[in-house]
Each structure stands twice: as structure tokens, then as C-alpha cells.
A protein has these predicted regions:
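PRPP-associated nucleotide enzymes
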Residues: 1-177
Length: 177
């Protein structure tokens, strides 16, 4: 397993593990999706292989970031898959960062840029107030826009971000810079 840490962006990536080849084979690439020029990495093949998925979740759940956080925050939508499994394995509460129009109640919102456009994420204030330190979980790190959006939302509200855990990093997009 390779752990990469960037203090500047508070990002850790659990990217590879002992069954690297098997994991890579399960991540499919779709050219020109969701728009021309984008190579979309589909990580959903991982959850179709229970033993690989289980090993990945065990590895991610045993990180110091997860051990030391009060809660896990998962990013809409594929981050929910990995975040909820890690949350269950580590016995940590999970909070969700959702796209516009998906959460009820009093929200805090942050806009961000991604590889193929603009978007925003929201958190429920009432849930956020329960925890002080977070591990952020998503499926993939591309430009870093989504991860930085969540990090900024948390930090701007007095919360500590211990790190980010992802399954895949698209290094050519320099999301950690």
C-alpha cells in the first residue's frame, strides 16, 4: 500500500494495495464521458467483487486518519459507497456532502470547479455541529476541486480536516497541487 501525504492540502490517498492489478482491472475507463475530452474512471466494478471491496475497505478503515477522526464525511455520490463501508467498519459516524437540492434543513454551501464544469456542495449545519474533526472520503481525486470544496466548508466552520481517502488518483490532473 502507498500512502501519499500533502500537508498543503491535507490530503492522504490510499491508492494501491497488495491486489493492485486486480483493483486496476475493476476500474473501467469511459472515453468522452460525461463530455468530450474526459476519460471517466468508473470504480463501481470494485463493489462487484466482494473480496476486493472488503480488503480495500479494511485497508482504508485502518488508516490513522480514520482512527483519529470523530466523523467521516463522504462526498456525493460514489464517495457514499466507500464512506459508508468505512464508517461501518471503523464504527464512526458518517456525514454527507451533497450536490444542490439534495439536502433538507439549514445548509452551508460552497461552490467549486471540477474537471468538466462547476458545481457546489452542501452540508447540514445541525449535523456538522456535532463533530470537530473529519476524515473526507471520496472515490476519486481528479483536479482536487471537490476535496478542497469540502475541506474549505469544514475549515470555514471551525472544523479540522485530518485527511482525504480516495480509491483512485488521476495524477495527470495534479489534484494535490
Amino acid at each position: 500500500m502507498i500512502n501519499l501525504l500533502s500537508q498543503k492540502n491535507y490530503i492522504i490517498i490510499l491508492y494501491l494495495f497488495e491486489k493492485m492489478k486486480k483493483l486496476e482491472d475493476l476500474i473501467l475507463t469511459y472515453k468522452d464521458f460525461p463530455k468530450k475530452g474526459i476519460d471517466f474512471k468508473d470504480v463501481l466494478g470494485i463493489i462487484q467483487e466482494p473480496e476486493v471491496f472488503k480488503e480495500l475497505i479494511l485497508k482504508m478503515s485502518n488508516s490513522k486518519i480514520i482512527e483519529n477522526c470523530e466523523a467521516i464525511i463522504s462526498i456525493d455520490a460514489r464517495g457514499f459507497i466507500f464512506g459508508s463501508a468505512i464508517s461501518l467498519q471503523a464504527s464512526k459516524p458518517m456525514v454527507v456532502a451533497r450536490k444542490p437540492g439534495k439536502l433538507p434543513g439549514d445548509l452551508i454551501k460552497q461552490n467549486y470547479s471540477l474537471e468538466y464544469g462547476e458545481s457546489s456542495l452542501s452540508l447540514q449545519k445541525s449535523i456538522l455541529s456535532k463533530y470537530d474533526s473529519f476524515a473526507v472520503v471520496d472515490d476519486l481525486l481528479a483536479t482536487g476541486g471537490t476535496a478542497n470544496c469540502v475541506s474549505n466548508l469544514l475549515k470555514n466552520n471551525g472544523k479540522e480536516v485530518l485527511g482525504l481517502l480516495t480509491v483512485v488518483e488521476l495524477t495527470k490532473l495534479e489534484g494535490r497541487s
